[in-house]
């Protein structure tokens, strides 16, 4: 039940109820299947000692959660970690703060959920107080934090009064990294806000979603139309068939805060384009609301224009390039150096596309227009500004679309990449890059690694820095002549192999540097997943669940891997130690 985030209680738990809640129903099932258990449970147990009361259920959940947390803190073992935090309201409008810790154990990066805290105020001081309370409860220290990762909200990221600054006052080594995945999303949003035509395009996409997805009937029409067209192309042999192919599609609504949502929406629009146009025609002809008819007519005109097809394919390509980066950034074990490398690669791809991608893009656009009977433009004709047709522009359509549209959007996208990912050029990451095992440790630089120790004064004293200087020379010679270190893809693999070869014992100071690089956060995707679990546990039907019970349920639902390792004996021991009981939990 905890593993599946299932509810415990039932709406009606009386004897006449047909379903008395999952917890009691499960006990009934076990009782019916096991005669020994049946003799000592529910009605066959003393009335004051049945061990099924709501308070008992909460205590059992609390014990499971405590055993999960115990495992996590044993893995951390008083070592350094990074702090990932975000806040969101639950179904009952309570502000809940998720706390995730990122740490290294046995050379492997772990991101673990350690608590859901109800905060009555979301200012930085309140959030810090809540974090300190949680840390004291679990015997953690702010001094052990070596990285901070939050979203871009003002109450989190403010230079002077944000949570980042408050923690930095107490611990100068708790370096802040703005969520890379969130920054990537902001790159897309920023261009949409700054470029008039791109902004207009996404505004029209939103209007299209409102019209096409406004009712179940219209959504069904899109699916049915798509199904018919798939059957046609299968019949003509134009597409392959097989398991997982040609599945039912539907349009997805994009959102500024949902990573990758714009890309999925545009991709689906290309796949479902004729079906979407059919629905718009239906709305215009059949709908009794004149406003909806006008809106559908305007959307038809816009999306069947060359301009809209141009921006559809341009933004689809840009988002397609960044989608791989977005997916990679959301991995729990992603390390900061690999993330920086991926950001640089993505930026280079965009720069290359700006240099030689226009002709290829134009071919795709022309093919799409021909397939869907959309009028194209002669690229060699003089461009006519639709806003002022009498004014002569003296430029061709090709010049307009290549230089004033394509190049402008690409330049803005590339510029936003540089502005948003300013951490990439920071001295801290430049020094950390010297740890990279790529190409036989070609970036190895002892001076940068010695400089890196100065960023962490609490982790290296003067004697250790002197020792490290000599240790680095032996380390690089050793790993460059060891085949096991020859083809490593990043510092995550380097940490794992150092543990496997026990070189972390031979070069403990180098391994300490490596851990500091690995714990630095990349993205807050794990935090977002915790909020998703919270919404499963505390739903509209379970909106009165108390904070402690919610916290225990969410911990178990998120950390399924650890929950599977918790034994019944551990839980029973914890249960008996909580308070004096009339009887033991057997």
Model regions: which residues?
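Alpha-helical structural modules in large enzymes and assemblies
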Residues: 1-586
């Amino acid at each position: 039940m905890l593993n599946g985030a299932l509810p415990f209680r039932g709406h009606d738990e009386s004897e006449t109820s047909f379903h008395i809640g999952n917890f009691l129903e499960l006990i009934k099932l076990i009782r019916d299947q096991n005669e020994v258990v049946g003799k000592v449970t529910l009605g066959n147990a003393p009335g004051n000692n049945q061990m099924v009361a709501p308070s008992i259920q909460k205590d059992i959940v609390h014990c499971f959660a405590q055993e999960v947390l115990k495992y996590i803190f044993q893995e951390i073992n008083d070592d350094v970690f990074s702090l990932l935090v975000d806040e969101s309201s639950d179904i009952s409008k309570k502000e809940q703060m998720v706390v995730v810790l990122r740490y290294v154990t046995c050379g492997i990066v772990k991101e673990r959920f350690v608590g859901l805290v109800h905060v009555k105020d979301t200012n930085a001081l309140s959030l810090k107080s809540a974090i300190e309370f949680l840390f004291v409860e679990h015997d953690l220290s702010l001094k052990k934090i070596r990285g901070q990762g939050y979203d871009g909200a003002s109450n989190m990221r403010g230079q002077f009064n944000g949570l980042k600054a408050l923690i930095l006052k107490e611990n100068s080594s708790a370096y802040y990294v703005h969520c890379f995945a969130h920054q990537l999303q902001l790159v897309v949003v920023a261009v949409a806000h700054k470029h008039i035509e791109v902004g207009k395009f996404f505004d029209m996409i939103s209007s299209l979603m409102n019209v096409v997805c406004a009712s179940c009937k219209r959504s069904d029409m899109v699916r049915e139309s798509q199904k018919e067209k798939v059957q046609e192309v299968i019949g003509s042999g134009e597409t392959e068939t097989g398991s997982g192919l040609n599945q039912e599609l539907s349009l997805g609504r994009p959102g500024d805060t949902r990573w990758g949502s714009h890309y999925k929406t545009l991709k689906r629009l290309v796949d479902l384009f004729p079906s979407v146009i059919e629905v718009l025609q239906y709305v215009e002809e059949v709908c009794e609301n004149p406003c909806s008819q006008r809106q559908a007519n305007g959307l038809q005109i816009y999306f069947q224009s060359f301009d809209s097809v141009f921006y559809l394919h341009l933004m689809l390509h840009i988002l397609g390039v960044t989608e791989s980066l977005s997916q990679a950034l959301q991995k729990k074990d992603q390390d900061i150096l690999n993330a920086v490398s991926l950001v640089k690669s993505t930026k280079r791809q965009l720069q290359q596309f700006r240099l030689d991608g226009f002709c290829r893009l134009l071919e795709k656009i022309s093919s799409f227009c021909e397939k869907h009977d959309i009028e194209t433009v002669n690229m060699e004709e003089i461009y006519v500004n639709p806003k002022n047709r009498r004014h002569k522009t003296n430029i061709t359509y090709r010049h307009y679309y290549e230089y004033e549209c394509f190049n402008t959007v690409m330049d803005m996208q590339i510029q936003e990449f540089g502005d948003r990912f300013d951490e990439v050029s920071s001295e801290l990451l430049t020094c950390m890059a010297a740890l990279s095992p790529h190409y036989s440790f070609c970036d190895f630089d002892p001076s940068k690694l010695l400089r890196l120790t100065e960023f962490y004064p609490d982790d290296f004293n003067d004697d250790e820095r002197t020792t490290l200087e000599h240790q680095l020379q032996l380390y690089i010679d050793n790993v460059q002549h060891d085949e096991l270190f020859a083809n490593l893809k990043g510092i995550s693999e380097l940490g794992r192999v150092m543990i496997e070869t026990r070189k972390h014992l031979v070069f403990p100071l180098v391994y300490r540097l490596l851990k500091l690089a690995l714990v630095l956060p990349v993205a807050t995707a794990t935090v977002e997943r915790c909020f998703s679990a919270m919404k499963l546990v505390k739903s509209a039907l379970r909106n009165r669940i108390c904070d402690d019970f919610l916290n225990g349920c969410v911990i178990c639902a998120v950390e399924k891997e650890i929950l599977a390792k918790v034994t019944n004996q551990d839980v029973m021991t914890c249960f008996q130690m909580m308070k004096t009981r009339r009887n033991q939990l057997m």
